[in-house]
Amino acid sequence: MWNQKPCFRFEIDNFSEKKDVIASKAFVSGGCEWFLYLYPKGQSLNDDHMSLYLSVANSKSLGSGWKRSAKFYFSVLNESDKELYRSTISQEFCLFCVQALAWGIRKALPLSKFEEKGFLEKDKLIVEVYIKNFEAVDGEGGGVSKKEEEETVEIIGSQDYASQVTLVRKIFAEHPEIAEEFKPKNQVFKKEYMNILRNAYRKVSELAEVKMDWVKSKIEEVSLEIKKRNDEVSEVPLDNKIADDDDDDYDEWEQDIEERLKNLEGMEFDSKLDSLKSKLDEISLERKKSYDADGSRVQQLEERVKDIELILKSKLEEVSSEKKKKADADGSLEDRVKNLELMVSDLKVEVDNEKAKSSADGFLLVEEVA
């Protein structure tokens, strides 16, 4: 008779996003440790079915010659516990050993089923496993249990509850010297010894967890302190921020003014720029002094810069005006020169005419004498 309650229930969220093999945590059934694993996209590239397997857990902690004999089946459900698939139960027992750590179904559910609309609810898949009638041999020095769903299992001569077998195996695996020296014949003494051993192991584990929790808390405190300091550095006080902004903006304004001064100097009007240079020096000295805490300093600097801009503008207009006057003066001089050139040209013409006339009169006179 199969138990109506599954031995283990494996819930997988975001199943459609899974590609690689998925393994469950270890669980105990009948005093033995097991775990499930499945291939959501098939065991190989050519497979078009999901694969399901039941495997022995922590096999390295078992003695040589260990084995498990069991029947089992899988039930695959959706989020609302609707059964989507149930595997068949084999007639023969499956023998789990070193050569065969796992048994299962290579072709369980077709992958095409998962593409059907509404097949999976909220992208969640649930796998339940039912295990029955097993024989467990823990290898050299281990005991044998043949009862169906036994409540206890014998480990190195000591009867332990199935729920505690994981802890006992863990102790013997991590400390094999205890298992080698543990050979009492008195059953009462065995039980008390195992209880003391389990309690001591739990106590040490709890202390280790407390220490780890303390270390984690300290790490979190340091992280919070670092984050707090970073926030304090990033959140600069308003006074300092205004001063820094003034400094940066004023550097740009000063650079711009200096470039304009250089352009004016290129026009060879040095005498008219002396006052501007002195004012620029005053501004540079004022910038090096400590700024007031309130924002009025920013407004004062902006007004000061505006005044400088106006002075520059007026000086540029003066320069442009003088340049224009000079150009006009040069133009009038050119006109006078042109007029003089015309007068000279006219005089030359008159002289040439007079010379020509004199030459003509002389020629006629010689002709008459002859």
Swiss-Prot record:
Signal peptide: none
A Pfam family that the UniProt record links to this protein: MATH_2
UniProt entry keywords in alphabetical sequence: Coiled coil
Keyword Coiled coil applies: yes
Coiled-coil spans in chain: 204-358
Residue intervals of the MATH domain: 5-131
SMART domains: MATH (SM00061)
Membrane-spanning intervals of the chain: none
UniProt cross-references to PANTHER family, sorted A to Z: MATH DOMAIN-CONTAINING PROTEIN, TRAF-LIKE SUPERFAMILY PROTEIN
Protein name: MATH domain and coiled-coil domain-containing protein At2g42480
